[in-house]
Amino acid sequence: MINPKITRRKTLKTFSGVATGSVAGCFTSAVQSEERRSPNDRPRVGVVGNGGIARSHARGLKPLADIVAIADVDRQHLEQYNAEYAAGKAQQFSAYRDLIDAPGIDAIFVCTPDHWHVKIAIDVMRAGKDVYCEKPATLTIDEGRTLCRVIKETGRVLQVGTQQRSSPKFQTAVALAHSQRLGKMKRVTVAIGSGPKGPAFDTSSPPSNLNWNMWQGQTPSVDYIAQRCHGNFRWWYE
């Protein structure tokens, strides 16, 4: 039986508190019931950045919300994402600010490269919308303080995409450890992955479908290198 007391706002609060690698992994039964509710009661979501992690989230969002607007500086990503995850019905924007200003959006996913996270999240909250922001939410301590201040000023919800920590399996493992069901903890092992290695890469002109200047945003401008763009941006430093 569908719970008539579940509103879009309540769904958004639940939605902001649960997230796995594909978001859907830890939906509650109440949230799952949203799939059977009227389309008018489903949250309307905008997605900024339409690369790999946004695709993962889109699969999890399907039973919970409707993707109604998308933005990306790569036209190819924009069109593919719309066709695959929004049935070609989402509004498309090349500038994220236009998506933020679009009416009828309840929450916005920020799935861009790291250096854009804080700027976009702040703009979204100041526009009166809630945010799901991929990790890392910030790159510096000062950015974190600024983000916290804006959250308090606006009263908006900001959920950071620490999907593993939110998953039921991970939370069960933590509970087992805390209760000593696994025995006394004697050692903690932490592994930090490393990126790929390679020689110096050649620069080239950016493809016509990519706004390279906007991709770089507020970072120092550098020549385009195909191997350092999109999903590979974290592995290389000057």
Where are these regions (language model features)?
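N-terminal Rossmann-like NAD(P) cofactor-binding module of classical short-chain dehydrogenase/reductase
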Residues: 108-109
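Alpha-helix C-terminal capping/helix-to-coil transition sites in glycosyltransferase folds
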Residues: 102-104
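Conserved SAM-binding strand-loop segment of SAM-dependent methyltransferases
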Residues: 90-95
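Predominantly a Rossmann-like dinucleotide-binding segment in NAD(P)-dependent oxidoreductases
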Residues: 49, 53, 154-159, 164-238
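N-terminal Rossmann-like dinucleotide-binding module
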Residues: 15-86, 167
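Beta-strand-loop-alpha-helix segment that lines the small-molecule cofactor/substrate pocket
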Residues: 113-114, 118-166, 180
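N-terminal secretory signal peptides and thylakoid transit peptides that target proteins
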Residues: 2-19
